[in-house]
From Swiss-Prot:
Places the protein is found: Archaeal flagellum
Family under the similarity heading: Belongs to the FlaH family.
Main localization (coarse): other
Name used for this protein in its record: Archaeal flagellar ATP-binding protein FlaH
Xref: Pfam families: ATPase (PF06745)
Gene name tied to this protein: flaH
Physiological role: Component of the archaellum.
């Protein structure tokens, strides 16, 4: 089994995730709004790029300019990766208010070859994109397709807000994934913290921490709390 490196010198995220991410993985990151899904996706995308993997990032959250500014604020510098083509950023931000265009996103996502030419493919936020046509049959087709893509030594990452999908569809997405992470926020000592709980991790490279408590610091990105509270 081969593993993609996710190590950055300034944080310990890679240690919490077992030292690396197995190739052929499908990573499901689930949580409500502002629970930390996107920052985890951004942290993973940056470390993949820093370790010489190419990456497609399909986003409902930000325009290209907004994404670059957000990453820069966290010192996740991606400008050169965009310019040299290692990072393909695809903003679908305008589509989230256009239901007509959203209706066939599942079909479009399986026929847009450019998405899958990179080593890593990230959808943030997948539930927003498929909420209008997320029947069990269509989602089953999508996950079968993503499994075929991942089997070619690629890694698929997607985030979802479970409130945007039916319970049956959320269960299908969790079941199809090789790694499931649930994010949430909580108050501790008067401060708001984020947590990422690994509830499923197939083919882990090594021991991993089931609950990672972290905060987001400007100029640093994710800062793992040493004294984690589960």
């Amino acid at each position: 089994m081969k593993y993609a490196k996710i190590e950055l010198e300034r944080d310990d995220v890679h240690k919490r995730f077992g030292g690396g991410i197995p190739l052929c993985s499908i990573i499901h990151i689930e949580g409500e709004e502002s629970s930390g899904k996107s920052i985890l996706s951004q942290r993973l995308s940056y470390c993949f790029l820093q370790n010489s993997y190419s990456l497609s990032y399909i986003s409902t959250q930000s325009t290209t300019t907004e994404f670059v500014k957000q990453m820069t604020s966290l010192k996740y510098m991606i400008n050169k990766k965009l310019l040299n083509g290692n990072l393909l950023y695809i903003p679908v931000y305008p589509l989230i208010s256009d239901n007509t265009q959203k209706d066939d996103f599942i079909k479009k996502s399986m026929t847009t070859r450019a998405f899958y030419e990179k080593d890593i493919i990230i959808f943030d936020c997948l539930s927003t994109l498929i909420s209008n046509d997320a029947s069990e049959v269509q989602v089953g087709d999508l996950m079968s397709f993503l499994k075929r893509i991942a089997s070619m030594n690629k890694i698929i990452v997607y985030t979802i807000n479970p409130k945007e999908l039916s319970d049956q569809v959320v269960t299908m997405l969790r079941t199809a994934a090789t790694m499931v992470i649930k994010t949430e926020t909580f108050s501790f000592g008067g401060n708001l913290k984020n947590s990422a709980k690994i509830v499923k991790y197939n083919m882990a490279a090594g021991p991993f921490q089931k609950v990672m408590v972290f905060r987001v610091d400007p100029g640093l990105g994710i800062a793992v709390e040493i004294s984690s509270v589960a």
